[in-house]
Amino acid sequence: MDNKIRTTIYLMPGMAASPKIFELIEFPPQYKIIYLKWIKPNVNESIKYYAKRMSELINDDQPILIGVSFGGILVQEISKHVKVKKIIIISSVKSRVELSLSMRFAKKTGIHHLLPLNLIDDLEKILLFVFGPSIKARVNAYKKYLSERDPEYLKWSINQIVNWKQIKYDKNII
């Protein structure tokens, strides 16, 4: 490749997911690829301040931000702290108006606070018990791709999605 400046793409996985979800995606050589990982949220930290901390990991001018699901919400929040070339969201929403009925129900009722997220570490054992050895390949995929299992992080993430305030969004989001 000649001396052209490459555009950097930052990839943000969805809630509980590891950057390994992107491992089979190939990008043309004119792009520099950086995989973002979830960092532990501070106690009572808003998504606004979390995004500010995450934005400190971005060291390139006008990158492209790509986020999946909750990662799509986060890259939109990061873009409020960093000038970006483009935001691409996958299986995500652009504003709270687009949140699913179940998320809106959770916001109104607070039912999301009752989820037994401490069982997440036992998910493989539960699935193997219920479905038997035939589910082993799927369980191994869960271990590989859904590696963020800290119950406090998961509670924080769900709460941030349910209570996300964004109504107006960048019209250039893909």
Language-model-detected regions and their locations in the chain:
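Active-site catalytic motif of lipid deacylating hydrolases and related acyltransferases
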Residues: 2-61, 109-120
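Short, conserved loop/helix-junction motifs that constitute active-site signature segments
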Residues: 2-4, 26-28, 81-82, 166-171
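Short hydrophobic segments within beta-strands
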Residues: 11-12, 66, 90
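Active-site signature of alpha/beta-hydrolase-fold catalytic machinery across serine-
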Residues: 24, 77-78
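Gly/Ala-rich beta-loop-alpha elbow adjacent to hydrolase catalytic centers
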Residues: 66-75
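Flexible "cap/lid" loop of the alpha/beta hydrolase fold
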Residues: 83-116, 162
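Helix-loop "lid/cap" segments that line or gate small-molecule binding pockets
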Residues: 122-135, 145, 161
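Conserved serine/cysteine hydrolase catalytic core
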Residues: 153-174
